[in-house]
């Protein structure tokens, strides 16, 4: 008799900003985005999602084109009121969650962070975005975030071992490998990126990480355009990819959407039993990577 398959139902939420008015208070803009997400989080619970991930700094617009200090007001402790609110909703459905927010460690020390909670609402820890871009046409993130200092943690939820790699991180294979070495079965990549800059890479990099490291990835991008900056269209197309590099499920380019997929954890052993990348890697030969 074979063992019962371990299937994990995962969800991604891609969402447009409902209040595109730079003249409104930061707290009001954030509240509108949170209110919009609450209904979608509830829907995920009703649909039986076991692990849910939201988009990069989900509770507001992608404000990095502004280089305005007013957006420092958007930062909060982690864990904090926003992450605890989401975790409380998810707990009612026994749903683990990844909650990306703008973190304030102390005055002047701010991070791009994702909090991870287990299905019973227990706070498991956080991942801080390691790679901080300064890239046209408006990704001025060094104005807002310090580079992460917490390594590449993997969180043991009730359903699976989860890692997080935020947006620009995905351009760097080194951290993706660290997540695999640390035991990740599913890596979530919450993002905010626009057409014309990275859309072709969106279809390449995460499947490559999934194949090279033998895990699933859940990749999220927001949708719509955000005034007043209008740096381009956030092209959505959130998706899940399996350890073979095959797309399991994909969302639209332009609609608010909850994407749900059932992921077979048995495929991880199957793929790693064929492609022995962990056995055959040569860390002693890679010193040049960190020596310069």
Where is each model-derived feature located?
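Acidic/histidine-rich helix-loop elements
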Residues: 18-31, 141
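Cys-nucleophile CN-hydrolase/nitrilase-fold catalytic domain and related Cys-dependent amidase chemistry
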Residues: 26-126, 193-212
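CN hydrolase (nitrilase-like) catalytic-core segments centered on the catalytic cysteine
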Residues: 75-98, 161, 167-258
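Active-site catalytic loop in hydrolytic enzyme cores
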Residues: 84, 88, 105-185, 195-208, ...
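Short beta-strand scaffold segments in enzyme catalytic cores
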Residues: 99-101, 113-116, 153-155, 238-240, ...
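Residue-level detector of high-confidence beta-strand sites
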Residues: 113, 126-128, 189, 250, ...
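A conserved C-terminal secondary-structure "cap"
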Residues: 268-292
């Amino acid at each position: 008799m074979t063992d019962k398959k371990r299937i994990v139902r995962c969800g991604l939420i891609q969402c447009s900003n409902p209040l595109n008015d730079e003249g409104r208070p930061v707290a009001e803009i954030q509240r509108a985005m949170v209110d919009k997400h609450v209904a979608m989080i509830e829907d995920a619970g009703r649909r039986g999602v076991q692990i849910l991930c939201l988009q990069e700094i989900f509770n507001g617009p992608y404000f990095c084109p502004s280089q305005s200090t007013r957006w420092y007001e958007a930062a909060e402790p982690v864990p904090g009121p926003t992450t605890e609110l989401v975790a409380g909703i998810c707990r009612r459905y026994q749903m683990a969650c990844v909650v990306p927010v703008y973190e304030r460690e102390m005055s002047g020390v701010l991070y791009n962070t994702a909090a991870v909670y287990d299905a019973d609402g227990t706070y498991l820890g956080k991942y801080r975005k390691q790679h901080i871009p300064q890239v046209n046409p408006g990704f001025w993130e060094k104005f807002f975030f310090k580079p992460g200092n917490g390594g590449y943690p993997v969180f043991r939820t009730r359903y699976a071992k989860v890692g997080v790699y935020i947006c620009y991180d995905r351009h760097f294979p080194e951290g993706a490998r660290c997540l695999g070495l640390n035991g990740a079965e599913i890596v979530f990549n919450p993002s905010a990126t626009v057409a014309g800059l990275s859309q072709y890479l969106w279809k390449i990099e995460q499947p490559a990480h999934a194949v090279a490291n033998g895990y699933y990835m859940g990749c999220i991008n927001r949708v719509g355009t955000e005034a007043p900056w209008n740096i381009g269209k956030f092209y959505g197309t959130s998706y899940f990819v399996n350890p073979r590099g095959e797309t399991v499920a994909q969302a639209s380019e332009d609609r608010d959407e909850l994407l749900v997929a059932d992921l077979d954890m048995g495929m991880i052993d199957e793929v790693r039993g064929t492609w022995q990348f962990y056995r055959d890697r040569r860390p002693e030969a890679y010193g040049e990577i960190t020596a310069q």
